[in-house]
């Protein structure tokens, strides 16, 4: 939620988690994490422990069950959560206020130890469900890539070939368009076509080269 203080703490459990069930049937695990800072002493050339911070933590529902099954006294953990302040009435009747950390995540620190994670039944079900959904997503994808994609590509080739052939036919029609089949072809060397050429049909006579008309033509 907005406005909440989220922190991360690294430390050791001071005792085993205490698991209890509240009136609504929800399980809650409570324990304390001791976070001790270490500083370097230049005089002794050694690390020294500073003042420890004891943070009271609470985990709810499935996280509470997992903490009770996994965490033990002295284990070094990394926890993240939200700081919350609550008030309660002590056994002596006094009213007290404490600041607690409501955990969102917690796990073992691997800096000085190793750990092996074992999934619970609820976690396995959710993981397998995600795997099944992933496989289900692969099948439509494969069908689209192999069948739908190839079909579309073949259709594209057909359209390309059809367009290319159609374009070739159109190009042939444009080439034949200037020819008029009803009009005869004009022969520029014939007398019929000499109306616009004048004496072009008599070109080559002796008079054209300065000779007499009685001279034989070439």
UniProtKB/Swiss-Prot annotation:
UniProt-annotated stretches for the region Disordered: 115-150, 166-218
Organism domain of life: Bacteria
Biased amino acid composition, Gly residues: 123-136
Biological process (GO), any one: DNA replication
Keyword Nucleotidyltransferase included in the entry's annotation: no
InterPro entries per the UniProt record, alphabetical: NA-bd_OB-fold, Primosome_PriB/ssb, ssDNA-bd
Record's compositionally biased regions (Low complexity): 171-185, 192-209
A GO CC term attached to the entry: nucleoid
Keywords: DNA-binding
Entry's Gene Ontology molecular function annotations: single-stranded DNA binding
All copies of domain SSB, residue ranges: 1-110
Matches recorded under CDD domains: SSB_OBF (cd04496)
Pfam family, one: SSB
Subunit note: Homotetramer.
Name of this protein: Single-stranded DNA-binding protein
Source organism per UniProt: Bifidobacterium longum (strain NCC 2705)
């Amino acid at each position: 939620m907005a406005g909440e203080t989220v922190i991360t703490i690294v430390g050791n459990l001071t005792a085993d988690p205490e698991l209890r069930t509240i009136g609504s049937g929800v399980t809650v695990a409570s324990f304390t994490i001791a976070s001790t800072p270490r500083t370097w002493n230049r005089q002794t050339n050694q690390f020294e422990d500073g003042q420890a911070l004891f943070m009271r933590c609470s985990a709810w529902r499935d996280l509470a069950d997992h903490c009770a099954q996994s965490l033990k006294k002295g284990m070094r953990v990394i926890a993240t959560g939200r700081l919350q302040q609550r008030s309660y009435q002590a056994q002596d009747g006094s009213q007290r206020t404490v600041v607690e950390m409501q955990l969102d995540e917690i796990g073992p620190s691997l800096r000085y130890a190793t750990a092996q994670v074992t999934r619970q039944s609820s976690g396995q079900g959710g993981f397998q469900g995600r795997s099944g959904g992933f496989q289900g997503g692969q099948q439509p994808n494969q069908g689209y890539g192999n069948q739908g994609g190839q079909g579309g590509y073949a259709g594209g080739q057909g359209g390309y070939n059809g367009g290319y052939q159609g374009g070739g036919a159109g190009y042939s029609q444009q080439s034949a368009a200037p020819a008029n089949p009803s009009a005869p072809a004009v022969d520029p060397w014939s007398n019929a076509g000499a109306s616009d050429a004048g004496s072009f049909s008599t070109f080559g006579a002796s008079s054209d080269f300065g000779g007499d008309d009685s001279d034989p033509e070439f």
